[in-house]
């Protein structure tokens, strides 16, 4: 399909539907409420995964930091769902757009920094100057630490965008090679198709890992400010 300059501004669609519709409905289908005293295996597995994720991220936090538990589990569910839905044929992955990832990263990062200034302003400002810094280097180090602080949300967004985009490009290139070789050399087609299948499996893992990494880094930023 030919694309023009304004393709990135088009509304993302998944199987002909706006991407926002299945993304909003998908969590309610994945995590249904049980009407019985004993949950079935699917709900039990989902609750175990949620508790395991929260245990990995929230153990290091104090009481103030643990108030973000619902936000973080919602974030990892949203990113993982978006990444996985983007692997469906004829669909679009919103997390390949830097603008969307920045729209997620900047408010979350700003929230952690604002929490730090509200709870312990002195300690938050102290992070801008490492302990034991020589006096002549103090102005330069404050500038460097301030720049590194403001780079954090950009690094979050760029990391997610680059990893998801790179995987999709590889799948597109290998898929195109499979189609081309099917008309040139039939014996080579199964080999490349096997590689494409393995790459798709790897992309599923990358989609889940990147959701975890993004949420974990937000959790670490929160830990530094609470």
From Swiss-Prot:
Alphabetical list of CDD domains matching this protein: ATP-synt_Fo_a_6
Nucleus found in the keyword field: no
Compartments reported by the entry: Mitochondrion inner membrane
Any one GO BP annotation for this protein: proton motive force-driven ATP synthesis
Record's bilayer topology term: Multi-pass membrane protein
Domain of life: Eukaryota
UniProt keyword list: ATP synthesis, CF(0), Hydrogen ion transport, Ion transport, Membrane, Mitochondrion, Mitochondrion inner membrane, Transmembrane, Transmembrane helix, Transport
Reactions accelerated catalytically: H(+)(in) = H(+)(out)
Pfam families: ATP-synt_A
Molecular functions (GO terms): proton channel activity; proton-transporting ATP synthase activity, rotational mechanism
Sequence intervals crossing the membrane: 12-32, 68-88, 97-117, 138-158, 164-184, 200-222
One GO cellular component term noted in the UniProt record for this chain: mitochondrial inner membrane
Subunit note: Component of the ATP synthase complex composed at least of ATP5F1A/subunit alpha, ATP5F1B/subunit beta, ATP5MC1/subunit c (homooctomer), MT-ATP6/subunit a, MT-ATP8/subunit 8, ATP5ME/subunit e, ATP5MF/subunit f, ATP5MG/subunit g, ATP5MK/subunit k, ATP5MJ/subunit j, ATP5F1C/subunit gamma, ATP5F1D/subunit delta, ATP5F1E/subunit epsilon, ATP5PF/subunit F6, ATP5PB/subunit b, ATP5PD/subunit d, ATP5PO/subunit OSCP.
Protein family membership: Belongs to the ATPase A chain family.
Described purpose of this protein according to its UniProt entry: Subunit a, of the mitochondrial membrane ATP synthase complex (F(1)F(0) ATP synthase or Complex V) that produces ATP from ADP in the presence of a proton gradient across the membrane which is generated by electron transport complexes of the respiratory chain. ATP synthase complex consist of a soluble F(1) head domain - the catalytic core - and a membrane F(1) domain - the membrane proton channel. These two domains are linked by a central stalk rotating inside the F(1) region and a stationary peripheral stalk.
The protein, known as: ATP synthase F(0) complex subunit a
Species for this entry: Hylobates lar (Lar gibbon)
């Amino acid at each position: 399909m030919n694309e023009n300059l304004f393709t990135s501004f088009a509304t993302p669609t998944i199987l002909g539907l706006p991407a926002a519709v299945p993304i909003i409905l998908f969590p309610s289908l994945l995590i249904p409420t049980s009407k019985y005293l004993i949950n079935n295996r699917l709900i039990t597995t989902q609750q175990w995964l949620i508790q395991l994720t929260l245990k990995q991220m929230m153990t290091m936090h104090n009481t103030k930091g643990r108030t973000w538990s619902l936000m973080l589990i919602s974030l990892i569910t949203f990113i993982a769902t978006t990444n996985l839905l983007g692997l469906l044929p004829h669909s679009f992955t919103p997390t390949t757009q830097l603008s969307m990832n920045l729209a997620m990263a900047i408010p979350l990062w700003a929230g952690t920094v604002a929490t730090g200034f509200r709870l312990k302003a002195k300690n938050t400002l102290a992070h801008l100057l490492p302990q034991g810094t020589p006096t002549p280097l103090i102005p330069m180090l404050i500038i460097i630490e301030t720049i590194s602080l403001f780079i954090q949300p950009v690094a979050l967004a760029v990391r997610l965008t680059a990893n998801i985009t790179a995987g999709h490009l590889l799948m597109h290139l290998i898929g195109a090679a499979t189609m081309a070789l099917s008309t040139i050399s039939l014996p080579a087609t199964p080999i490349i198709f096997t590689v494409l299948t393995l790459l798709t499996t790897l992309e599923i893992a990358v989609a889940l890992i990147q959701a975890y990494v993004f949420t974990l880094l937000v959790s670490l930023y929160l830990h530094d400010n609470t």
